[in-house]
Regions:
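Post-DEXD/H (motif II) to motif III coupling segment of the RecA-like Helicase ATP-binding lobe
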Residues: 1-45
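Hydrophobic/aromatic beta-strand patches that form the interior of the parallel beta-sheet core
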Residues: 2-4, 31, 126, 174, ...
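A structural signal for short, well-ordered beta-strand segments and their strand-loop junctions
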Residues: 4-6, 74-76, 175
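Short, solvent-exposed loop/turn and secondary-structure capping segments
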Residues: 15-18, 86-87, 166-167, 185-186
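A short acidic, often aromatic-flanked loop/helix-cap motif at beta-alpha or helix-coil junctions
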Residues: 35-43, 56-59, 131-137, 212-214
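Conserved C-terminal RecA-like helicase domain
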Residues: 51-163, 179-180
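Conserved RecA-like P-loop NTPase helicase motor core
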Residues: 131-242
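The feature captures the C-terminal accessory region of ATP-dependent helicases
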Residues: 252-261
């Protein structure tokens, strides 16, 4: 009889490893298959970019600069109770769509919005933040049965479209708000790293509030985060770096730590 231990992540939960080191030693030899090996085996997708963008005030003011509407993009808005959620989730979705362009039509069968950009292009935009169950199910059924690249241009989500969601034409993931969980970040990155014809580069961008700190401190914090994500994609056992980004609008009475910038 053979017993095999498999995990897609060393850091599930980001605080407690899936397996203790002494238990892991019982399963030898260990075989790792990381994201970079996966990319090397792809036919079309050859590179992955990971970066951070910053906003001041409300994130909606930076959406146009951070979002490339010529790329197939998955947008994750901040958690409902997150400090970057400046209004209700439905209003945030409406504001994002308004930054993309003007809604000129909607497919009632699938609840796909047709949005005209300022330069005249028509984009197909899906809203998975919608609470109406029949509407969500209709859209999800549509997403699960997409057969062409032109079926969707932009998808806006909140807590869905992460693990297990397959949109092979997705080129970019724009995630708004600080994500403390490396597991969540790697899950989201996985949404844009599917191999398909016509896609040579995938991009993950985290749009976060600009800290009230010196450029050097911000750079150090971002580099720590990028290193942690890179190590995670290599399937190394790492824990998420803990940085508390203080912005000008944060409560001044909020206690500081040596990881506050």
């Amino acid at each position: 009889a053979h017993i095999m231990a498999m995990t897609g992540s060393y850091f599930r939960g980001d605080a407690v490893p899936v397996m203790r080191p002494e238990d892991e030693q019982l399963f030898q030899p260990a075989i790792n298959y990381n994201y970079y090996q996966q990319l090397n085996g792809y036919k079309y997708l050859k590179s992955l970019g990971i970066g951070y963008a910053f906003f001041q005030g409300q994130y909606i003011t930076a959406i146009r600069e951070a979002l490339d509407t010529t790329k197939k993009t998955l947008i994750h808005i901040p958690p409902v109770q997150g400090r970057d959620a400046y209004t209700g989730k439905h209003d945030q979705v409406a504001d994002i769509i308004a930054q993309i362009g003007e809604v000129v039509d909607e497919e009632p069968e699938h609840f796909i919005k047709i949005v005209r950009t300022p330069d005249g292009r028509l984009l197909r935009v899906g809203d998975l933040v919608e609470d109406n169950i029949p509407m969500r199910r209709s859209l999800q059924a549509y997403l699960n049965n997409m057969k062409s690249r032109d079926a969707l241009d932009i998808l806006i989500a909140l807590g869905t479209a992460k693990e297990g969601f397959d949109w092979e034409w997705c080129e970019c993931c724009l995630t708004i708000g600080i994500r403390a969980s490396l597991t969540e970040v790697v899950q989201i990155i996985g949404r844009c790293t599917r191999d398909c014809a016509g896609k040579t580069h995938a991009q993950f961008t985290n749009l976060i509030p600009c800290p009230e700190a010196a450029q050097e401190e911000v750079g150090a914090a971002v580099n720590d985060m990028l290193k942690a994500i890179t190590a995670s994609l290599l399937m190394e056992q790492v824990m998420a770096p803990k940085w508390d980004f203080r912005t000008k609008r944060d409560d001044e009475e909020q206690p500081e730590t040596d990881r506050t910038i």
